[in-house]
A protein has these predicted regions:
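Short, solvent-exposed loop/turn segments at secondary-structure junctions
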Residues: 71-74, 113-114
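Ligand-binding beta-strand-loop-alpha-helix segment within the catalytic cores
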Residues: 7-72, 80-85, 138-144, 149-157, ...
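Short active-site-adjacent helix-start/loop capping segments
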Residues: 1-3, 72-73
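Internal alpha/beta core interface subdomains
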Residues: 3, 81-203
Length: 203
């Protein structure tokens, strides 16, 4: 999303905060040393970060935050918290709510889980052993924005998930059936074809 908003390539491996990778794998290539990306009236502004700029935001503004889990049927999104004081979400969500900023979670359908995420977050808040650096699960009030919403917004077509998973690198994939007028469908399929040529996010 950042790359598309900027309109240019950048070092994505330097814009990684939380991450999920195979157990025991080396993720030292993933950094978090690039500044937050902030736009005001369509133009990028430098020298500010999310925790600072959110105090100037209000109704009509968007705050984008990825999600670790979604439940599409219940319209829920949740973020795993791997920081002792809540990370970016912990530092901003109170201001986001009080200033009526629109919190949007862009996340792939691959993040779908068959769980009530509010109930799951309550269970995870109980004392007990935990594998990895996860302090909790934060079920938010934010809006979901998946491939379904993206295709509807860009091409005014309907996307229906009909399959998930695969082999040889397609383990996190989803299969969508698309419905709409011929021309937007053809345009969407052409773009999807280009996206499918992109390599995995790895060193």
């Amino acid at each position: 999303i950042v790359e598309e908003l900027l309109g240019e390539a950048f070092e994505k491996n330097r814009y990684v905060t939380g991450r999920t990778a195979p157990a025991g794998s080396d993720t030292s290539w993933a950094k978090a040393d690039l500044p937050d990306v902030v736009f005001r009236k369509g133009k990028r502004i430098d020298g500010v970060d999310a925790t600072g700029i959110v105090k100037e935001m209000g109704p009509g503004d968007l705050f984008l935050k990825g999600a670790n889990a979604i439940n599409y049927d219940l319209d829920q999104a949740a973020v795993l918290i791997g920081h002792p004081v809540g990370g970016t979400l912990g530092a901003t969500v109170g201001t986001v709510v009080s200033r009526k900023v629109r919190l949007v979670h862009p996340a792939g359908i691959e993040k779908s889980v068959p769980t009530d995420l509010v109930a799951a977050s309550q269970r995870l808040s109980q004392e007990g052993p935990c594998m990895g650096d996860v302090y909790g699960l934060w079920a938010t009030h934010g809006e979901l924005f998946t491939e379904i919403e993206a295709l509807a917004a860009l091409f005014d077509i309907e996307a229906v998930p009909v399959g998930a998973g695969g082999i040889a690198g397609a383990e996190g994939s989803v299969t969508l059936s698309l419905f709409g007028e011929k021309e937007p469908l053809e345009t969407a399929l052409a773009l999807i074809g280009e996206i499918q040529k992109e390599g995995p996010f790895a060193p």
